[in-house]
Amino acid sequence: MPKEVIVESFELDHTIVKAPYVRLISEEFGPQGDVITNFDVRLVQPNQAAIETAGLHTIEHLLAKLIRQRIDGMIDCSPFGCRTGFHLIMWGKHSSTDIAKIITSSLEEIATSITWEDVPGTTIESCGNYKDHSLFAAKEWAQLILKQGISDDPFNRHVTS
């Protein structure tokens, strides 16, 4: 008989969250005592908006670089299939507030100063779908998200600065 599992993100009531926000999903502890933290980086309101793939793809590539420039320990930042945000996996303990500030700073850079030459992994050799990028869309979404502010609480708006 298959093992019964609960996938936390499918237990979250997506109708009561208030995006954009950063939410600590879990802290996992390894056998040697090491800690991995998993965050829900929700950029748009579930079931009301979705970032089209080209813009999301470009944001993904930029966050892979920009987050690592701002904090050590990033393992991965992968988009949700629903296209409303990302899972951010980190080594060590981190707060939602600190991660929200890092995401805000990264989106500010995307919105204001990133050029096409700054986007990593946009060649046929470095990306599995290199034609599906849009810096224009990434900048537009970054501006829209920043206008709302990123909260460190998924249920009550508490925008970090």
From Swiss-Prot:
Residue ranges of the TM segments: none
Keywords: Autoinducer synthesis, Iron, Lyase, Metal-binding, Quorum sensing
S-S bridge residues: none
Binding-site residues, Fe cation: H57, H61, C127
Molecular function via GO: iron ion binding; S-ribosylhomocysteine lyase activity
GO biological process, one term: quorum sensing
Catalytic activity: S-(5-deoxy-D-ribos-5-yl)-L-homocysteine = (S)-4,5-dihydroxypentane-2,3-dione + L-homocysteine
Origin: domain of life: Bacteria
Cofactor(s) in the UniProt record: Fe cation
EC id: 4.4.1.21
Free-text comment on the cofactor: Binds 1 Fe cation per subunit.
Family affiliation: Belongs to the LuxS family.
NCBIfam families referenced in this protein's UniProt entry, alphabetically: PRK02260.2-5 (NF002607), PRK02260.3-1 (NF002608)
Role noted for this protein: Involved in the synthesis of autoinducer 2 (AI-2) which is secreted by bacteria and is used to communicate both the cell density and the metabolic potential of the environment. The regulation of gene expression in response to changes in cell density is called quorum sensing. Catalyzes the transformation of S-ribosylhomocysteine (RHC) to homocysteine (HC) and 4,5-dihydroxy-2,3-pentadione (DPD).
Assembly and oligomerization: Homodimer.
The protein, known as: S-ribosylhomocysteine lyase
Gene name of this polypeptide: luxS
